[in-house]
């Protein structure tokens, strides 16, 4: 081998190695971690019945929330959903530093608005109230720029062809599987609803596993709208139980997707029906807030309970009836709340021209 060839070969090797490193093929996997000490604000996502659009609200203290777009949708449902409307938004910060959202692809007033000829997509007798087949998936690096896709649950696996609904998706990172576990309410035909879990692909566009039941309510009773929060070594599965009304209960397990045992003690403080429970932690405090949708009052509102031990819950009332406040919006539906950094909150406020300090 002559010297000229060796020099050329060396240059080629350097070029190849540089290319592999720059494309990430040899790069060490980076998992951005943002600890609670870096958090400085809260982001609430919700929707409204009158628009079936997606809304964002910010809070500095976790008590008072301000809509970023003056109570107008930040994303219109008809731009991302097959049914031209979304419901039940959920948001999480992924292990890769990206933000992930999952929403129900459903418009319950589509016929009234001339968006379809029938009350529901399919027969209400055969597939039930609010029948749908899809979920909307969103992904963003910065809470501002979003990509989206529609996951047709009924087409994902042959076993799901006859589903009656796919509602209220939520997500949690399963570190053991290195995957986002998504779980959502589902029924077959016009049968009973319960919650199923699945693992998403890396691109967050498809399910990798056939959904399985995550929890069986005693005596086969129906339940909907699950939320999983890990505290210590325990997983707390909050649900909307349909056992003698609609109210919030929890089941507890040592495992993320199995072994849940019901604690039938009610967690909400409502006299009437509520659903869509979700938990967020107060920054720097040993306190968690349970927030849920009190759909049975008019106008509907959110209700709140607070806990420090996940056994005893102190009722905080509704928005604008106690310590929890809104500054510029009302009649919200189906909430989810995450902690965000001061910089993320400021960037989001600047995007929507919201004058708010953090």
Residue ranges and their predicted role:
Residues 1-33:
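Bacterial Sec-dependent N-terminal signal peptides
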Residues 28-358:
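Carbohydrate-active catalytic/glycan-binding domains of CAZyme proteins
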């Amino acid at each position: 081998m002559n010297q000229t060839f060796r020099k050329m070969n060396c240059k080629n090797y350097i070029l190849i190695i540089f290319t592999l490193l720059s494309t990430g093929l040899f790069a060490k996997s980076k998992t951005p971690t943002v600890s609670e000490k870096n958090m400085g604000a809260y982001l609430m996502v919700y929707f409204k019945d009158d628009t079936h659009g997606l809304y964002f609200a910010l809070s500095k203290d976790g008590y008072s929330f301000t809509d970023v777009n003056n109570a107008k949708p930040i994303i219109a449902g008809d731009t991302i959903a097959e049914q031209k409307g979304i419901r039940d938004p959920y948001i999480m910060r992924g292990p890769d530093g990206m933000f992930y959202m999952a929403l129900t692809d459903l418009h319950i007033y589509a016929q009234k608005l001339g968006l379809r000829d029938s009350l529901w997509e399919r027969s209400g007798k055969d597939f039930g109230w609010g029948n749908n087949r899809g979920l909307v998936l969103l992904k963003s690096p910065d809470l501002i720029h979003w990509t989206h896709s529609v996951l047709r649950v009924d087409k994902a696996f042959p076993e799901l062809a006859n589903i009656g609904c796919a509602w209220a998706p939520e997500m949690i990172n399963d570190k053991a599987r290195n995957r986002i576990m998504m779980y959502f309410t589902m029924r077959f035909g016009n049968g009973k609803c319960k919650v199923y879990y699945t693992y998403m692909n890396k691109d967050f566009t498809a399910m990798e596993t056939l959904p399985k039941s995550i929890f069986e309510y005693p005596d086969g009773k129906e339940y909907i709208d699950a939320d999983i929060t890990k505290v210590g070594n325990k997983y707390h599965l909050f649900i909307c139980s349909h056992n003698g009304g609609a109210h919030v209960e929890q089941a507890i397990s040592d495992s993320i997707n199995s072994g849940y045992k019901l604690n039938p003690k009610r967690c909400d403080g409502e006299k009437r029906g509520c659903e869509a429970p979700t938990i967020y932690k107060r920054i720097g405090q040993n306190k968690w807030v349970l927030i849920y949708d009190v759909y049975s009052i008019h106008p509907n509102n959110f209700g709140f309970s607070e806990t420090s031990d996940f056994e005893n819950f102190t009722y905080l009332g509704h928005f604008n009836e106690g310590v929890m406040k809104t500054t510029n919006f009302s009649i919200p539906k189906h909430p989810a709340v995450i902690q965000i950094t001061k910089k993320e909150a400021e960037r989001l406020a600047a995007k929507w021209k919201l004058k708010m300090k953090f």
